[in-house]
Regions:
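A feature for loop-to-transmembrane-helix boundaries and adjacent hydrophobic helices
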Residues: 1-310
Length: 310
């Protein structure tokens, strides 16, 4: 990772821009988490306790999930190699799970319900994702697509050229989407004066968009053949949100939601295979992908509105 990441020098010490953006994102996330805690009138010390737990648990879970699901790492797996986290190798989903675990532990210690903290967590998380994904622009390998074969896209600002091929800057799209979600949740909380309902809504929106972006990524990060392991985890995220929304509308809707999830899973595998192995235009395939993922997103929003819940 060191050879592939842009560095800077400060007071005689070497720093890395990617790490700086991750740290900036973490700081923004914790600041907004504290702000939303104040708006929700959480118990004194809740935000401080969460902050103390979140960073170590986020790093730990991110590293552990990477070590478990990155198949290239398995060939050199050892406890010593797993502990050498400073050389790179982290999972975004693992970081989110670590933050959720920190929120749950905080709720247990403070003897308060966990759900309000998880709502606050989901509303603040896009700030971290936005900055962390932007930081990938200072690496050579993270956050880029397969080689582009569409001239107008290859010559746009969304493309990165390495002298041989042009690649889509997927990290830019992810950062922009996370930024939009951060603003959306901030405006939503400001209007409603509560973060209630943010958890499921965030799982639905973040899960569907990240499932698409993980498909666009082709950086060998946590992949098995043409399938991204993180894509599967993000798909589980939006599927869980969809089914929970459906449960509020009756058992019949749960069956429909499960059927839709199965349909989307089958369609996604088929599209992934075609993207990886066929000569069909990637633009057409990704247009179909967007329509496919719009199905659970739209259905989830419909169930949310129908159930008249936050």
């Amino acid at each position: 990772m060191f050879e592939e990441t842009a560095a800077f020098s400060l007071f005689g010490l070497t720093g890395y821009w990617y790490g700086a953006f991750v740290a900036w994102g973490a700081a923004l996330f914790l600041l907004f988490f504290a702000r939303y805690c104040r708006m929700e009138k959480c118990k004194n010390g809740t935000a401080a306790l969460f902050s103390a737990l979140c960073i170590p648990l986020g790093l730990l879970c991110s590293r552990v999930l990477f070590c478990l699901l990155d198949f290239r790492f398995h060939g050199m797996f050892s406890l010593r190699a797993a502990a050498m986290f400073w050389g790179g190798g982290f999972s975004m989903v693992g970081a989110l799970l670590g933050a959720a675990l920190a929120a749950w532990i905080t709720a247990r210690i403070q003897k308060i319900p966990a759900l309000p903290l998880l709502d606050i967590l989901m509303a603040a998380l896009p700030f971290f994702i936005c900055a962390a994904r932007m930081g990938e622009g200072f690496t050579e390998l993270l956050g880029r697509s397969r080689p582009l074969n569409t001239a107008w896209l290859a010559n746009s600002f969304l493309a990165q050229n390495d002298g041989y091929d042009a690649y889509l800057r997927t990290y830019l799209l992810e950062s922009l989407t996370a930024g939009i979600l951060a603003i959306f949740f901030a405006a939503r909380i400001q209007k409603r004066k509560t973060a209630q309902g943010s958890l499921l809504l965030g799982m639905l929106l973040l899960g569907t968009t990240q499932a698409l972006f993980e498909s666009l990524r082709f950086d060998s990060h946590m992949r098995y053949s043409f399938i991204s392991m993180q894509q599967i985890l993000f798909a589980c995220m939006f599927a869980a949100a969809l089914i929970l929304y459906a449960a509020r509308c009756g058992k019949k809707q749960v069956i429909i939601a499960i059927a839709v999830c199965a349909l989307v899973a089958g369609g996604a595998v088929g599209l992934e295979f075609m993207i990886d192995r066929s000569s069909v235009s990637s633009l057409l395939l990704y247009a179909a992908y967007i329509l496919l993922l719009a199905l659970p997103a739209g259905l989830g929003l419909y169930y949310k509105k129908r159930s008249k819940t936050p």
